[in-house]
């Protein structure tokens, strides 16, 4: 890798763009793409990186890749285009109000859903325009069964029905016996929710809660 980038925290993803199957990874110095067959370095987008704690995995759709370093710095979208030399990454937008925390983002029907410092936010994937913004603070998000599950950094959990122009909280609770966060902002509730086999799993540090969320007969 040019520059010898160190690894960050984000997971690699796979996309087909600009005529090539690529592995896309958010490294210490930015988002990069490499040819999946040959390992050839193709492109880099550095604006969303403040390294080394680049945490959220990128999102790829068609020829576009969205990234945020998850440190409330901002998020950016690039379009990948084939060139005579390989592949270029051309910035479409960089915005600070878009989902930009370590809790990830969900791409659904052309909109990104996630959290920023203020709370849950919906933005148009194509242009970064904010559709709506809520309060409640940052958190991690999961999409399942037509709803967002939000695990706030403060420990609370919310079930949310979302759409481009709508936000409806259908319920919320705080799991009991919360662990002590002894190191302040360096030790928040950062774990993503998990839904499997009709159960919701919430973890915070060494504590795990499991809830039956199957519909009642």
Residue ranges and their predicted role:
Residues 73-75, 96-165:
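Loop/turn-rich, solvent-exposed surfaces of beta-rich toroidal or solenoidal domains
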Residues 1-20, 26, 44-61, 68-72, ...:
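Extracytoplasmic beta-rich repeat domains
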């Amino acid at each position: 890798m040019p520059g010898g980038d160190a690894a960050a925290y984000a997971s690699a993803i796979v996309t087909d763009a600009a005529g090539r199957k690529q592995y896309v990874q958010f490294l210490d110095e930015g988002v990069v793409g490499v040819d999946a067959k040959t390992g050839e370095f193709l492109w880099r987008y550095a604006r969303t990186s403040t390294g080394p704690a680049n945490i959220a995995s990128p999102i790829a759709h068609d020829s576009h890749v969205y990234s945020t370093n998850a440190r409330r710095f901002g998020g950016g979208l690039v379009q990948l285009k084939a060139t005579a030399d390989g592949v270029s990454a051309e910035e479409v937008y960089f915005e600070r109000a878009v989902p930009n925390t370590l809790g990830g983002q969900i791409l659904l029907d052309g909109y990104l859903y996630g959290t920023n410092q203020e709370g849950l936010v919906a933005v148009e994937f194509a242009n970064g325009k904010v559709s709506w913004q809520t309060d409640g603070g940052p958190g991690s998000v999961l999409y399942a069964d037509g709803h967002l599950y939000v695990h706030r950094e403060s420990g609370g959990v919310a079930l949310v029905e979302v759409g481009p122009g709508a936000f409806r909280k259908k319920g919320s609770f705080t799991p009991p016996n919360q662990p002590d966060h002894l190191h302040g902002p360096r030790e928040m509730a950062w774990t993503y929710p998990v839904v499997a086999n009709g159960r919701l799993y919430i973890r915070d540090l060494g504590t795990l809660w499991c809830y039956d969320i199957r519909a009642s007969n």
